[in-house]
Amino acid sequence: KIQIIENGPRGVAFKVTQRDGKSTFNNIIALSSGGQCVEIYSETEWQSLCTLAKEQFCFNANNDTATFDLALGAIKRKNMSEKLYEVPAQNWVDLTDKSGKYGISVISECKYGWDKFDNSTLRMTVLHTPKYNYRIDSMQSMMDLGLNRYSYAIFSHEGEVGADTQL
């Protein structure tokens, strides 16, 4: 279900509601008038056991390498492989087109697991309920169940990734 919730001089926003099994995903996607990025506010009632959920971003930028923020620096990583299927990033991940003329950054203050599926796709892990408890007292099989709120933004830029391309 898609519903327009704001369309005026301040900007535009719409709400997308989706269900998967017993879980409900509500995303508000907003662009402020004159804004530099698209902001996404997510509220998920997570009731899926033994499941991992990811937000997937498919872009026109094409490169087998992306840049992942590590808080004290950044690292370039290639597309995922059988042995490297998820990597950490602190605040942002950037996919700059191999031409170097433009790129896209996904900025998140609270989600840290990522993968680069192919030359134009980034995926951010947002929820996870493992199948097993790996420690008897950990309750990992209940992790992330219930209401979860998180936000992220998509920011486009000219040129290579750098200090001036991050918000």
Q: At which residue positions do the language-model features occur?
A:
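C-terminal (or distal) subdomains of carbohydrate-active enzymes
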Residues: 1-167
